[in-house]
Amino acid sequence: MNASFWNYPSKQKSWPIDEEMESLGEVIHPLDNIGGFDVRPGFYQMNGAYQTEEGVSFTVSSHGATSCVLLLFRPAAQEPYARIRIPESYKIGNTYSILVFGLKAEDFEYAYQMDGPADQARGLLFNRKHTLLDPYAKAVTGQRNWGEKPEGGKDFVYKARVVQSDFDWGRYRNLNYKFEDLVIYEMHVRGFTKDASSGVKGGGTFEGLRQKIPYLKDLGINAVELMPIFEFDEMESARVVDGVQLYNYWGYNTVSFFAPNTSYAFHQEHNHEGDELKRLIRELKENGIEVILDVVFNHTAEGNENGPCFCFKGIDNNIYYMLTPDGYYYNFSGCGNVLNCNHPVVRRFITDCLRHWAVEYRVDGFRFDLASILGRDQNGAPMENPPILEALAFDSILGDMKLIAEAWDAGGLYQVGSFPSWNRWAEWNGRYRDDMRSFLKGDSGVAGRAITRITGSSDMYDPASRGYSASVNFLTCHDGFTLYDLYSYNEKHNEKNGWNNTDGDNNGMSWNCGVEGETDDPAVMGLRRRLVKNAFAALLCSRGPAMFFAGDEFCNTQYGNNNAYCQDNIISWLDWNRLEEFQEIHDFARFMIHFRAKHPILRRDTKPAVCGLPSVSIHNGEPNRNYTDYNTHLIGIMYAGRNADDTDDDMIFYGMNAYWEPLEMRLPSLPESYHWKLVVNTFCEYQDGVDFEAQTQGDQTRVRVPERSTVILLAEHDL
């Protein structure tokens, strides 16, 4: 067999095989002519389409197909100008590969048609009339502008483009922050800047987000977690409710896993479709901010048996999806189908996809939506050691990627604290969210659990193995109330979603502080502001990585909607006018993020303090009452260790009073020559650049904590 079958193309205009052949005085020649196109077998180990000196190599695999036709389209055309049936002799194993001479990437788009058996009971859905998207497509055409009907209307087909890989990353370097040092800022690319109040050009795009990097850097976060940015169909299930157009806004319905979402690009660059995203990632990292992608490998946009067939269904339906014995789709995702993640073919596909984003886009990690689905076998049963999770944990390219699991699924599997990890996987700690929400709003009987969560959830994450670096602590995310709404609404208000308020979580553990929704009552608003500050103080004094939702730092609201997946409007968009209205909250959040950065003991163990104090100690709050008592609402935690540059001991006391009356707390004793200084009191209004009543404590044995407030004290040397 000719050597060219097995060589990889480089990312330049020529392939290594070209150079090798030229050095031998040989060139690659066509072997056949099909429909006027010179062709030869392509590059079998390079899935997808790649430009070469001679033309373009196309490679696609199917276990069940009996034939494969390559379709070539002029840009934006709906009908192909060429159909090239790939010869059976060009098929090795289950892989079709063909090199078409003379093609230039900018001149065409492509798709496939496959024939084979059609038997739904066996999960076989081959139909030679279906136009199929390349699973490895690096760019997808057809939905260029957000919310517009696809090109071609009801006859629309997805097509792929060949993308040039020549982006200049400059002096690129990995930031490689420790997991527990992360402060993660979860955001929706469109919603972050789409509202005119953002003040950027190209709002709702990667470019719009890029213009907000100075804001993010000043805030102090060191990682962004981008909600789905793979090509998705916002028009899926689009509908009008009360005169308002609703979309599949969040994007958890992937169309193409290797391609960035077309409508998120402000600059549409043919054959360089990913460059705007790459510029964003490059500048984020130049400013000290890692990039984590929210990825959806639990289901696809093809839906169930009533859904469209544009990719996996027509290529190998019974391999890519989990099917019941009678050929229907399991639905552990709640979205119509489930990817068969532990089938060897799908396992390789997922690994290849993540490698692509790690290499081509230089991302730093991935958050896996409904990750417990990746732990199910091909019949849907949970596995003790799922092959796909193990493969990703030990993959050589993904070796320094951050892997974060949403450790549950819609089928009832809940694995927070027990997700298979190989000491590589972290988890969204849903129990942190629930226990801390309960304590912060004043519930009884949860103080002990709150202390466990703040100090690293050792009941779930064994300090001898993963420890608290595996616990991604959060109080809010895209799914649920915003932080402001958590203290403004007792009940969800999802009526505008069109489901009679039946969708969304019914147990958000929220409290409206006495008035449902917006109010001008100064007492209510003062309490809400204080509770938001308490939440930031607790989150940023908790051991392990921290995460919050974009806009929480200036009290962005979704008006009580806790499931805004379909709202492409001010309900989901950030209202940057609130930054001025809630400047104090922003400044407090910024202060706490920077305070956490200056004091490593707040987020992880450091070298032991020379003075001999333990890394973490728990202190009684009310005299003669232990924090484990059912009715206590007062907790105190002291952290001790070495400071950031290992030049001195560092000691911090965190105290929280969730009770509705002021309470006194006993302060732990300090070593000789140290005294306590009050640096945070959430009862007081914060002024940027001025510590919260920063002063030496007159009484070094106790501190008065106002009702529903937090205090933080820092040990200082005596003068």
Residue ranges and their predicted role:
Residues 110, 114-171, 234-254, 259, ...:
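Core domains of carbohydrate- and sulfate-ester-processing enzymes
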Residues 183-185, 224, 291-293, 366, ...:
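Hydrophobic faces of well-ordered beta-strands that scaffold small-molecule active sites
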Residues 188-207, 211-363, 370-394, 413, ...:
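Substrate-binding/active-site clefts of carbohydrate-active enzymes
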